[in-house]
Design a protein with these regions (language model features):
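Bacterial N-terminal signal peptides
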Residues: 9-24
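Flexible, solvent-exposed loop/hinge segments and secondary-structure transition points
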Residues: 25-167
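N-terminal secretory signal peptides that target proteins for export/translocation
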Residues: 1-7
Length: 167
């Protein structure tokens, strides 16, 4: 009887183990699109050139899906703070999937929002998420123009330049 119970328990354990391994084996790999370096460079350069054409010296940062810097360019004649600001704007837009300037309104609605304590967080306008459909694959931030709305206009020009490749 003891052997029968032991054998039954071993068979049950084997069945459970085989089922679990079968589930793991049938798991799917994640499939997603990421920004290439060449697209990120085009976005950053176009944003900087657009602002320059309007008389503004800016820096630009493009971050990828995980908030990592893909390209960061300090524009000619920009202040040293523009590199950090452009990154914070891009990181915020990527993290929340919204224009960085919208964070100010969200923070006013919820002053206890934990996001304000994140390293790299800002409420400054001047960054937009980069999307393929509804999937946020990165973001670009610009800093240096006199006003976040001007930074954001340059960002939009950069994204628009590669819009046909974001599919």
């Amino acid at each position: 009887m003891f052997r029968s119970t032991l054998r039954s328990g071993a068979l049950t354990f084997g069945y459970v183990l085989a089922s679990a391994l079968g589930s793991i084996a049938s798991a799917q790999l994640l499939n997603h699109k990421d920004l290439s370096a060449s697209i990120a460079i085009t976005i950053a350069q176009t944003a900087i050139e657009t602002c320059k054409a309007n008389g503004y010296a800016v820096s630009a940062t493009v971050v990828g899906r995980n908030g990592e810097v893909i390209v960061q360019i300090r524009g000619d004649g920009t202040g040293p703070h523009t590199m950090e600001n452009s990154f914070k704007k891009a990181f915020t837009a990527r993290t929340f999937g919204i224009p960085s300037g919208e964070m100010e309104d969200r923070l006013k609605q919820n002053p206890q929002m934990g996001a304000q304590y994140l390293t790299g967080f800002t409420t400054a306008q001047g960054a937009l998420p980069i999307k393929v459909g509804e999937d946020v694959i990165g973001a670009v931030g610009v800093s240096g123009a006199p006003g976040g709305e001007k930074d954001e206009a340059c960002v939009k020009a950069g994204i628009d330049k590669v819009a046909d490749q974001l599919k």
